């Protein structure tokens, strides 16, 4: 029987791709999900705020006719200073308060004709008064009647004062898929709203819990009372200055501080532990550990966390056709920027050619072999993609990593000649061409128009990288700043433990006292008993560890063993004597 190949699921790469296809949604699912060209139309009702996406209570509008709720747009303007819908600059003084009439049922109506305003009504507002009317009313009574006065307040206005809030013939203005802050993933919530939503107790309907609600409220009250009581006790002890007999005041204050604050967590502590406590608990061959210690990250691992180093990097690629100045986005692609800077400082890109150049597409280089199949990262292996962030292939001069597939970045990179949206979430963007301090656009234009081999797209003659100069290394600046901060504000802490703390670490949770590593009981012979084998094994492990750091020497292939010659010991031979 044949083997079915029609899977009932799609892989993550297929779902994340721009060319994703779904039987129920058709082609372009990825673009629709990200707000691309084929994104589904989602209409916002006219009585909804364009920022909170909820019915407004204090409506205001911009000069372009976008409606917001005053309580939602003011925090946004204070933080960003832009219009969240189209990204244009916006000030609080630009907002126009809207006066919308209501009928007895609470529906929004035209104040003259009392016609109910719906999603299909052409709605306008007057800039100077803020009164909202149906377009039919203004057109029939004001424009055609040449009566340029507000029908409610009798104030004069001009045609320029008419602002369109909703036009059924132009529904794109209310299309959620085109809103700028939604496409970029910006949150419209304030910090207080975020804290309220993250609080688990706010997501529980206590009225529907019955007796359980009373228990939860009682637990919260008890916990709050205990916290207040503990705080009063600590403040009282600190004010009275209680010390043990024979203990100095300095030692007592140090003991109090260490009890309250605990051991300071190192700046490079990871979120996971070393695992020694779990390993010693499950294996008798491990040295017992009763405390969980956080693993420490190296300086490189610490800096290469996304968003840790936020300073931009700056470099220049000097080619045979001119210089190309680059701005490196360290905050969004730290691994790619680190790899590029380290390879450049190492001289890896010197005299390397651009092996691929396609007009209207991109130019690719960074392979020392010049074939497009070579290249190695600073770690000697591939490193993962970095797609999180707002960076897209949306303009000319985008600098990205070339790869052979998912998580296969090495040393090769390319510079785009135009917007390449189909490469989004497929290639890591880590920089952009800039015209500072010298113009880079002429060099990029010369590269694009340079003659190439039509079969291989290889430039003829070669476009060669003379050198890559690093002007600003953000990682060095970060380390210098950190060292300066440590020299100014940090104090030396004493990591030595008292005898009582050491005894606490040697007592397990079962109450059994555990000997420290290398300790022997009084009267025990160091040469006898089972322990001598354990010591021998530890010595062997130490010797093996020293051998591992010896430099590898290639002595050449081992000689092949000589083939054994079998002596004839009878048998039929080659059957030549047979008749």
From Swiss-Prot:
Could you tell me which Pfam families the record lists for this protein? Pro_isomerase, U-box
Q: Which residues cross the membrane?
A: none
Grouped into one coarse class, the protein's main location is: nucleus
Q: Which InterPro entries match?
A: Cyclophilin-like_dom_sf, Cyclophilin-type_PPIase_CS, Cyclophilin-type_PPIase_dom, Cyclophilin_A-like, PPIL2_U-box_dom, Ubox_domain, Znf_RING/FYVE/PHD
Its pathway?
Protein modification; protein ubiquitination
Residue ranges, compositional bias (Polar residues): 250-259
Q: Which domain of life is it from?
A: Eukaryota
Q: Which GO terms describe its molecular function?
A: peptidyl-prolyl cis-trans isomerase activity; ubiquitin protein ligase activity
Give every U-box domain span.
Answer: 42-115
List the catalytic activities from the record.
[protein]-peptidylproline (omega=180) = [protein]-peptidylproline (omega=0); S-ubiquitinyl-[E2 ubiquitin-conjugating enzyme]-L-cysteine + [acceptor protein]-L-lysine = [E2 ubiquitin-conjugating enzyme]-L-cysteine + N(6)-ubiquitinyl-[acceptor protein]-L-lysine
EC numbers: 2.3.2.27, 5.2.1.8
Sorted alphabetically, the Gene Ontology BP terms of this entry are: protein folding; protein ubiquitination
Show the segment(s) annotated as Disordered: 227-261, 555-579
Indicate the segments forming the PPIase cyclophilin-type domain, all copies: 311-470
Record-linked PROSITE patterns? CSA_PPIASE_1, CSA_PPIASE_2, U_BOX
Q: What task does this protein carry out?
A: May catalyze the cis-trans isomerization of proline imidic peptide bonds in oligopeptides thereby assisting the folding of proteins. May also function as a chaperone, playing a role in intracellular transport of proteins. May also have a protein ubiquitin ligase activity acting as an E3 ubiquitin protein ligase or as a ubiquitin-ubiquitin ligase promoting elongation of ubiquitin chains on proteins.
What is this protein identified as? Peptidyl-prolyl cis-trans isomerase-like 2
